[in-house]
């Protein structure tokens, strides 16, 4: 599968852009800065909208859970870094983000959105794209939602854990797999070990 220049199993498109960091400062960040860590890179349409703060706050509030498994979260939209800062300086009760634990990338030229295949050309905003990039910079997962529906932090965390498990042990993860659940050995005879435990 691919989206723009982003292809599963290939290096994720590199980017460099200004971001609002968790402390409120502006910083130029690039994907290469995160090599050696997993990255969940997700796009949202616009600041000061309706579904977007619920998603970003949900991810930010659980950033430590991702960091504990060597994974960083990065959010991006086509808004400027000044707009991002104003949104973080607006209280959550007023539709703002409040204090953030993750960087917000300003894709004002829309090149990152184009490279990742999430740009809604007619409106100049990003669809809700989410990309899981592994510690070697390889793209492992792509999800793109239409504008009205937000994403699940639980499912994103589960997917990162599953990819990390397969990377470490070489086994494959069945539907709904969670840490501690049985995996499948990718071998015709050895896989029967898993399937023999399933209900008839």
Curated annotation (Swiss-Prot):
Catalysed reactions listed for this entry:
a hydroperoxide + [thioredoxin]-dithiol = an alcohol + [thioredoxin]-disulfide + H2O
Q: Per the UniProt entry, what are the Gene Ontology biological process annotations, in alphabetical order?
A: cell redox homeostasis; hydrogen peroxide catabolic process; leukocyte activation; removal of superoxide radicals
**Top-level taxonomic group:** Eukaryota
Using the record's annotation, list all stretches that form the Thioredoxin domain.
Answer: 6-165
Catalytic residues?
A: 52
Q: Name one GO molecular function term.
A: thioredoxin peroxidase activity
* GO cellular component terms given for this protein: cytosol
Q: What is its EC number?
A: 1.11.1.24
Recorded hits in InterPro entries, A to Z, give: AhpC/TSA (IPR000866), Peroxiredoxin (IPR050217), Peroxiredoxin_AhpC-typ (IPR024706), Peroxiredoxin_C (IPR019479), Thioredoxin-like_sf (IPR036249), Thioredoxin_domain (IPR013766)
Q: One short Pfam family name for this protein?
A: 1-cysPrx_C
Return the Gene3D superfamilies for the record: Glutaredoxin
Task: List keywords of the entry alphabetically.
Answer: Antioxidant, Disulfide bond, Oxidoreductase, Peroxidase, Redox-active center
Subunit (UniProt): Homodimer; disulfide-linked, upon oxidation.
The further comment given in this record reads:
The active site is a conserved redox-active cysteine residue, the peroxidatic cysteine (C(P)), which makes the nucleophilic attack on the peroxide substrate. The peroxide oxidizes the C(P)-SH to cysteine sulfenic acid (C(P)-SOH), which then reacts with another cysteine residue, the resolving cysteine (C(R)), to form a disulfide bridge. The disulfide is subsequently reduced by an appropriate electron donor to complete the catalytic cycle. In this typical 2-Cys peroxiredoxin, C(R) is provided by the other dimeric subunit to form an intersubunit disulfide.
The text of the family note is: Belongs to the peroxiredoxin family. AhpC/Prx1 subfamily.
Function, as annotated: Thiol-specific peroxidase that catalyzes the reduction of hydrogen peroxide and organic hydroperoxides to water and alcohols, respectively. Plays a role in cell protection against oxidative stress by detoxifying peroxides and as sensor of hydrogen peroxide-mediated signaling events.
Please identify the protein, giving its name as recorded. Answer: Peroxiredoxin
């Amino acid at each position: 599968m691919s989206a723009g220049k982003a292809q599963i199993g290939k290096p994720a498109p590199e980017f460099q852009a200004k971001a609002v960091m968790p402390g409120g400062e502006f910083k130029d960040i690039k994907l290469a800065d995160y090599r050696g860590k997993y990255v969940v890179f997700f796009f949202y349409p616009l600041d000061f909208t309706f579904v977007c703060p619920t998603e970003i706050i949900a991810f930010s509030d659980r950033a430590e859970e991702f960091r504990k498994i060597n994974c960083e979260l990065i959010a991006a939209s086509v808004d400027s870094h000044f707009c991002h800062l104003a949104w973080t300086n607006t209280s959550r009760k007023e539709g703002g983000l409040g204090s953030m634990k993750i960087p917000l990338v300003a894709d004002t030229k829309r090149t990152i959105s184009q490279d990742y295949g999430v740009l809604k050309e007619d409106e100049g905003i990003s669809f809700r794209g989410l990309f899981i990039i592994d510690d070697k910079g390889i793209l492992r997962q792509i999800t793109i939602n239409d504008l009205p529906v937000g994403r699940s932090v639980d499912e994103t965390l589960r997917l990162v854990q599953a990819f990390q498990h397969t990377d470490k042990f070489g086994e494959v993860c069945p539907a709904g797999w969670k840490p501690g659940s049985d995996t499948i050995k990718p071998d015709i005879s050895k896989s029967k070990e898993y399937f023999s435990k399933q209900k008839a």
